Regions:
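A short acidic (Asp/Glu
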Residues: 27-29, 49-52, 100-103, 143-149, ...
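Short, solvent-exposed loop/turn segments at secondary-structure junctions
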Residues: 23-24, 70, 95-97, 138-141, ...
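Conserved catalytic core of nucleotide-sugar-dependent glycosyltransferases
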Residues: 98-182
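Active-site-proximal specificity loops/subdomain of glycosyltransferases
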Residues: 40-92, 97-110
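A structural signal for short, well-ordered beta-strand segments and their strand-loop junctions
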Residues: 89-92, 131-136, 191-195, 235-237
Length: 249
């Protein structure tokens, strides 16, 4: 959905997309946090989301629903819709619970609005010349840093994209955000990650979405795929378990 995001130093329109599968019950909560958005959902799921939208008394003009297929197909459909409007694409997972920022002058993180987070990301992207932006990969404030990193993994739960030519690899069903980060670094030599913006999602435990596809074999298959595509010098083990990786950038 086309939205206008304005700030003191920066203002523009963006396309807000929520990537979802099998979780129509999340529509009300996401609307309260995010506002108007287009929901990109799995094949043959639209009617369930339409029913949930009606039960939640949400406006069809503010909560649009598009059947777009699997995970990466949905991500790419959102990018292409943003391209048609000539605006950056904001993609969110469907289980956002809160957005905060960690000030170096405060002991605890402070809540911020969705629009404010987008403004900060876009301002930093423009300032450093990046075309993919995002937030800290964990919502744990212990790991927050008052800095922007230009060579770092951008977790796909909250991303801003303004290069419409780079698309997600539709051969992937998991860990597609690692590949997408590398595509941007390969082409543009940088990304933009705000390590002081913390977004809390429930995707590790919430049913549906990518979690429903997350099995040990699929995780390992996607890791092998990434290693073949980018090399073992770039795709490194995390040291925590065999299902997690890190990028050597």
């Amino acid at each position: 959905m086309l939205r206008e995001i304005r700030g003191d130093l920066y203002g523009e329109k963006v396309w807000v997309a929520i990537i979802s599968s099998d979780r129509p019950g999340n529509m009300r909560g996401m609307w309260e946090l995010v506002g108007g958005a287009t929901w990109y959902v799995g094949d043959r799921q639209a009617r369930y989301y339409e029913m949930a939208r009606e039960l939640a008394r949400l406006s069809p003009t503010e909560t649009q629903i598009v059947e777009s297929g699997k995970l990466c197909e949905s991500r790419n459909a959102a990018i292409k819709d943003a391209q048609r409007h000539g605006v950056p694409c904001v993609e969110l997972s469907d289980d956002l619970r809160k957005i905060e920022w960690k000030s170096p002058h405060e002991d605890k993180p402070l809540g911020i609005a969705f629009e404010q987070a987008i403004r900060w990301i876009r301002e930093e992207m423009v300032a450093i010349g990046a075309h993919l932006g995002g937030v800290a990969p964990t919502s744990n404030p212990f790991f927050a840093r008052s800095e922007t990193r230009d060579k770092a993994f951008i977790v796909g739960d909250f991303i801003v994209i303004d290069d419409h030519e780079l698309l997600f690899d539709e051969q992937m069903c998991l860990k597609e955000d690692y590949d997408y980060t590398l595509q941007h670094i390969q082409k543009h030599e940088k990304v933009c990650r705000l390590d002081y913006v913390l977004a809390t999602f429930l995707h590790r435990t919430n049913k549906g979405g990518a979690v429903s596809d997350r099995t040990g074999k699929k995780e390992l298959d996607m890791i092998d795929y990434l290693k073949k595509k980018w090399g073992t010098q770039v795709i490194r083990p995390s040291g925590r378990n065999e299902y997690e990786i890190r990028l050597n950038l």
